[in-house]
């Protein structure tokens, strides 16, 4: 399992990114990201995002000469990213049905993309400080079969994911600029009155 961590800063936003390369499901990994440093300014909101790609295949073989009726297969892929009080999660189910002859290997493949973003501007205290926060990223696959007879069934499912934690804030630099502007106006008014 390969995991990557990245950090970027844009205007009034600090974003931490966690990447998990395609890995056999189920999996769950815990990484840590820094809390928001209040020396940068005042934290206004936090957003957690999860984007994932899941793919896999099933191999079904009928072992019963007396049956050639439709069989149904399904797989539900789910991903989530949890940090602090926020959890971003989503799931997608892929299903299909086919008639399978005795002794023939029936192969089905699937590929899905799924994601979710959640944010909050309340109770931000847990996200502020000089320590780190655990980010738990996970992916699961749940499979189902419905049909008659004896059979052999094998599933292979994998998922990759990118989780981000974004801090949006009012920077101290912006506050200083506003303060300077107000100060200049006061000076001009004082000067004009002399």
Task: Locate the predicted segments by residue.
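N-terminal segment immediately downstream of the Sec signal-peptide cleavage site
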Residues: 11-65, 157-160, 164-175, 192-194
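Asparagine/serine/threonine-enriched low-complexity, disordered tracts
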Residues: 175-181, 185, 189
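Bacterial N-terminal signal peptides
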Residues: 1-4
């Amino acid at each position: 399992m390969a995991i990557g961590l990245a950090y970027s800063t844009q205007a009034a936003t600090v974003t931490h990114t966690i990447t998990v390369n395609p890995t056999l499901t189920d999996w769950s990994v815990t990484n840590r990201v820094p809390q928001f440093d209040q020396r940068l300014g005042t934290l206004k909101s936090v957003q957690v995002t999860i984007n994932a790609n899941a793919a896999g295949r099933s191999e079904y073989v009928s072992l019963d000469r007396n049956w050639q009726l439709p069989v149904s297969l399904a797989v539900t892929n789910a991903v989530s990213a949890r940090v602090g009080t926020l959890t971003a999660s989503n799931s997608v189910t892929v299903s299909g049905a086919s008639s399978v002859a005795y002794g023939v290997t029936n192969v089905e493949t699937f590929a899905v993309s799924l994601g979710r973003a959640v944010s909050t501007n309340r109770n931000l205290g847990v996200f502020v400080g000089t320590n780190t926060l655990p980010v738990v990223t996970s992916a699961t696959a749940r499979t189902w079969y419905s049909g008659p007879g004896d059979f052999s069934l094998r599933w292979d499912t994998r998922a990759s994911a990118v989780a981000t934690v974004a801090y949006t804030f009012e920077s101290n630099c912006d506050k200083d600029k506003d303060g300077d502007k107000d100060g200049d106006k006061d000076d001009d008014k004082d000067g004009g009155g002399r």
